[in-house]
A protein has these predicted regions:
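Loop-to-transmembrane helix entry/capping segments in MFS-fold secondary transporters
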Residues: 33, 127-139
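Transmembrane alpha-helical segments of major facilitator superfamily
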Residues: 38-47, 139, 143
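Helix-to-loop junctions at the C-terminal end of transmembrane segments
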Residues: 50-62, 158-159
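Structural signature of the two symmetry-related core transmembrane helices
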Residues: 65-80, 171
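Intracellular juxtamembrane helix-capping segments at the cytosolic ends
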Residues: 113-127
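A membrane-interface helix-boundary motif in multi-pass transporters
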Residues: 156-174
């Protein structure tokens, strides 16, 4: 499916940038080493936990709608993460706790990380069972092509825009899907 190929490419871009540059982003936002490890753990565990409920929902409802809802949710939570991260370092009572950053990161991960599974399932809905493996291999290949460009593009974007360019990049690419 053309949708599967295009979205797999862009999702490869997203996921590679996310996992390679999250620690760089957190470092640039003055997180401690422990806080960086917490951020990385929360991203991974919430993405893993989200696979089952999001997959179950996509079995009940139209997968395209679940993909749209997930990308919209990931975009919104990326935007909210940008907003709270800009306020974390305000003086005194004006500061927003990093707890809100963690919460929005978890919700972002919950929406974003099951995306490849949804794309693969959506593609499999339109092909005969005998072609599932070939389609999966093709989507994985295209995902890999996107993954090669993600960290480079995101780092250039972060250099131009600043640290929050990381989540702006994620917001933008989720919007493309």
């Amino acid at each position: 499916s053309p949708f599967g190929m295009v979205s797999s490419f862009f999702y490869g871009t997203i996921q590679a940038a996310l996992f390679t540059l999250l620690a760089v982003y957190a470092t640039s936002m003055n997180f401690t080493i422990f806080e960086i490890s917490v951020v990385t753990f929360l991203l991974a565990i919430s993405g893993a936990i989200s696979q089952f409920p999001v997959g179950k929902i996509s079995d009940i409802y139209d997968r395209r709608k679940v993909i749209v809802f997930s990308t919209f949710g990931a975009s919104i939570f990326a935007l909210l993460t940008i907003i709270v991260s800009r306020q974390m370092y305000l003086p005194g009572d004006l500061a927003t706790s990093k707890t809100w950053f963690y919460i929005f990161l978890i919700l972002f991960s919950f929406c974003s990380l099951p995306m490849f599974s949804l794309i693969l399932a959506h593609t499999n809905d339109y092909i005969p069972k005998e072609k599932f493996v070939a389609a999966g291999a093709g989507l994985q290949f295209v995902f890999g092509l996107g993954a090669m460009s993600g960290p480079f593009l995101c780092s250039v974007f972060m250099d131009i825009v600043g640290s929050n360019g990381f989540f702006i990049f994620l917001f933008f690419f989720h919007g493309i899907i």
